């Protein structure tokens, strides 16, 4: 919804807050451990410092449940996780933030991210 375009259930225009598109997750399926949808915990790798991360450390784990991910959004990407490909974890465009993972299901790490968001 936040991106310019999505290919989830057809091709659709988004709101365009974030440059890029939402595409099907296509990890290296030669690895039998990698499934789609991805359901589980992955380390969050912070690419750019941001107040959203003030209460977490590099590499803390967050919980994903998804079959799609944002791509071609390098300018807006704040953090990624690895699923044989870099999966966009957090984007920001001005005052608009989005997460691919579920902060509300990410335990203490997610609560600290939500705390930082509430303080923005």
Each model region followed by its residue ranges:
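Cysteine-nucleophile active-site neighborhood
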Residues: 1-38, 115
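Short linear Ser/Thr-Pro motifs
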Residues: 4-6, 67, 106
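Active-site oxyanion/phosphate-handling segment shared across diverse enzymes
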Residues: 41-101
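Phosphate-coordinating loops and pocket residues in cytosolic domains that bind phosphorylated ligands
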Residues: 4, 93, 119
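Acyltransferase
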Residues: 101-120
């Amino acid at each position: 919804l936040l991106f310019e375009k999505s290919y989830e259930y057809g091709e659709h225009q988004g709101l365009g807050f974030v440059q890029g598109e939402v595409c099907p997750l296509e990890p290296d399926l030669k690895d039998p451990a990698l499934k789609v949808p991805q359901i589980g915990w992955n380390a969050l790798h912070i690419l750019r410092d941001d107040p959203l991360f003030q209460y977490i450390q590099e590499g803390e784990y967050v919980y994903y449940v998804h079959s799609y991910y944002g791509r071609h959004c390098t300018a807006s990407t704040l953090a990624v996780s690895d699923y044989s490909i870099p999966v966009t974890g957090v984007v920001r465009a001005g005052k608009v933030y989005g997460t691919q993972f579920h902060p509300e299901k990410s335990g203490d790490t997610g609560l600290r991210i939500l705390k930082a968001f509430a303080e923005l």
